[in-house]
Amino acid sequence: RIYLHHEMAQTPVFPSKLFFFCEQPAESGGATPICRSDCLVARLEHELPSFVEACAGKGLRYTHTMPADDDPGSGMGRSWRSTFRADSRAGCEVRMAELGYSAVWNSDGSLTATTPVLSGVKNLEDGRRVFFNQLIAAYSGFGPAGESPDHSIAFGDGEKLPADMVWKACQIAEELTFDIQWQTGQMAIVDNHVTMHGRRRFSGVRKILAALIA
């Protein structure tokens, strides 16, 4: 399972559009859930106003361990090479410095990196406000099983996120979610500025092709 998120919102650089094409749907499960963040932030402003303003005012920092090589089978399997478009540690370190990251190299070749402060809530050019982040995914599934989600995400000032409010936000997002039940040959275009997406659990072979547009 991959939890709801805006693609690469845990980085300073992210795509504007996502294109999906179903080559082969899973035997069971495997839907792509989508949730409009403008609708979500409207609900959150009504039910959790202090949480929304904290995300907007303080921003968010993410900490994530990236493998040396891509792992397509994992929702968190994007390597540091792919993330930073670097072929070497030295190149990666240069790119991280440009983007404001701090990081530690691990003995297995993986990289544990912490982002600069990134937005939790954005105002789009058309006036809409969106819950633009990877908060739900980071809190629900970035770290290893059993690890506190506080290791994966915090407010920009280092303060822990209020767990009760995070889980309430997750619940509201799920209420607003629509599942794309894939059929062979089906295509979907997602506006990454407005819409979060994820992946439901599945069994069997599932081939959904994806392309990211800057």
Q: Where in this protein do the model-derived segments appear?
A:
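Active-site environment of non-heme Fe oxygenases that use a 2-His-1-carboxylate facial triad
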Residues: 2-4, 13-214
